[in-house]
Design a protein with these regions (language model features):
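Acidic/hydrophobic-patterned starts of short beta strands in beta-sheet-rich repeat architectures
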Residues: 1, 32-42, 84-95, 138-150
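Short loop/turn segments that connect beta-strands within beta-propeller blades
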Residues: 9-12, 59-62, 110-112
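A short beta-strand motif characteristic of beta-propeller blades
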Residues: 12-19, 64-70, 118-124
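Proline-anchored loop/turn motifs at beta-strand termini and strand-loop-strand connectors
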Residues: 187-205
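Extended non-catalytic domains of envelope/secretory-pathway proteins
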Residues: 72-95, 114-115, 182-184, 188
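Repeated scaffold domains used in trafficking and secretory/extracellular systems
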Residues: 20-30, 72-82, 126-136
């Protein structure tokens, strides 16, 4: 794991006040007004089956852990932000075997910490971007989206990066809605955007 060192500043002096172990970390504005917290995922690969923990620390008089949750599988993506127009949360993406991913959506509670809302599972297909491009705002509406990849119906030697990307957004309940479909065909030199109404049943192949 890595170590995050936290210091206080008094005049021109730095004083170490805390050390936090982490595998993934994000410094987040908890209320949009400059109240910051430290969001940490810590993986434990020592066991036969990997596990991980999610922590939220707040600096009150000292650094305090205000939320903790254990999960099966290693955390590979930790992303905090808007998950709906008026809702903030965190996507915690974990895996036990790197062939299937589980995206946990946790909603921020007014009282502090998070509340588990849903889990979505999908097959992981490795691309050059690895895990860095799985959660992002793909359509510019300010809300985080989840990327899944759909393989062609036939066996293909195409690069996985040319597979159909289906981006999904939280449906406000316990699932994800399709919002955007894209094929980036670098081999033949075109991009193809698919209407979201097609994405629930679409099948395709390269010829």
């Amino acid at each position: 794991y890595n170590v995050l060192y936290i210091y206080s500043i008094e005049g021109n002096k730095l004083e170490e006040i805390e050390r936090v172990n982490y595998s993934l970390v994000d410094i987040v504005d908890l209320n949009g007004k400059g109240t910051y917290g430290v969001l940490v995922a810590l993986n434990d690969g020592g066991a036969q089956t990997p596990t991980s923990k999610l922590y939220l620390y707040k600096l009150i008089d000292k650094l305090e852990c205000v939320y903790e949750k254990s999960y099966d599988g290693a955390c590979v993506v930790l992303e905090y932000g808007k998950v709906a127009k008026n809702q903030t949360g965190v996507y915690y993406v974990r895996t036990s075997d790197y062939s299937k991913l589980n995206a946990e959506l946790l909603l921020k509670k007014v009282s502090g910490g998070f509340e588990e809302q849903m889990t979505s599972s999908f097959t992981y297909l490795n691309t050059a971007s690895g895990f860095s491009n799985i959660i992002k705002d793909v359509d510019g509406d300010g809300v985080l989206d989840v990327r899944t990849l759909v393989a062609p119906v036939e066996d293909t030697k195409r690069n996985v990066a040319e597979f159909l990307q289906v981006w999904k957004s939280w449906d406000g309940d316990v699932g994800l809605d399709n919002v955007y479909g894209l094929i980036e065909n670098a081999t033949d030199g075109y991009d193809l955007v698919l209407p979201k109404d097609w994405l629930g049943t679409v099948r395709y192949q390269y010829v």
